[in-house]
Swiss-Prot record:
Family: Belongs to the eukaryotic ribosomal protein eL24 family.
Bias (Basic and acidic residues): 118-135
Start and end residues of each stretch annotated as Disordered: 118-156
Protein name, UniProt field: Large ribosomal subunit protein eL24
Designated gene of the protein: RPL24
Gene3D superfamilies: 6.10.250.1270, Ribosomal protein L24e
SMART domains referenced in this protein's UniProt entry, alphabetically: TRASH
Length: 186
């Protein structure tokens, strides 16, 4: 039969079922103490790291070295196990490991070159589209004045700003949008 033991929140000692003192703080955090001595020291706000008989002190001052060394030995005896990564099998990984660095560098450079060419191609396409759009706007806009072109530029102020453009039109700014309105009053 296995007994579920808990640890004292102050001293770090084992507490067996039916033993210990349970303290529940107002923020509903539960503390379990081994005895009234641990409870009293906790409430008096003594630091367990300064009391020589607590587990925290022993750990900080390396008193239980023999037990920790055994645990460390157990941890380090794990055998390395090579697993395949998602998207690549073990054979592919082994093949890549064994291939020469020159071949690997050449493949990397080729991949980088391809990516750069693709980026350059997309930039050129965007420039061509932009040029077409500006040409079409210029050809359409020769007869009429563009919306934003007729307004004189003044100092940029926050909030609402009224500005007279001509004898019968007024523009007001809200943020960065300019809205034209013809006025009834002059």
């Amino acid at each position: 039969m296995v007994l579920k033991t808990e640890l004292c929140r102050f001293s770090g000692a084992k507490i067996y079922p039916g033993k210990g003192i349970r303290f529940i703080r107002s923020d509903s955090q539960v503390f379990l103490f081994a005895n009234s001595k641990c409870k009293r020291y906790f409430h008096n706000r003594l630091k367990p790291s300064k009391l020589t008989w607590t587990a925290m002190y022993r750990k900080q001052h390396k008193k239980d070295i023999a037990q920790e060394a055994v645990k460390k030995r157990r941890r380090t005896t794990k055998k390395p196990y090579s697993r395949s990564i998602v998207g690549a099998t073990l054979e592919v990984i082994q093949k890549r490991r064994t291939e020469k660095p020159e071949v690997r560098d050449a493949a990397r450079e080729a991949a980088l070159r391809e990516i750069k060419e693709r980026i350059k191609k997309t930039k050129d396409e965007k420039k061509a589209k932009k040029a077409e759009v500006t040409k079409s706007q210029k050809s359409q806009g020769k007869g009429s004045i563009a919306k934003g072109g007729a307004q004189p530029k003044g100092p940029k102020l926050g909030g609402w700003r009224w500005q007279a453009l001509s004898h019968c039109s007024v523009a007001y700014l809200l943020g960065s949008r300019v809205i034209d309105r013809t006025c009834l009053f002059v």
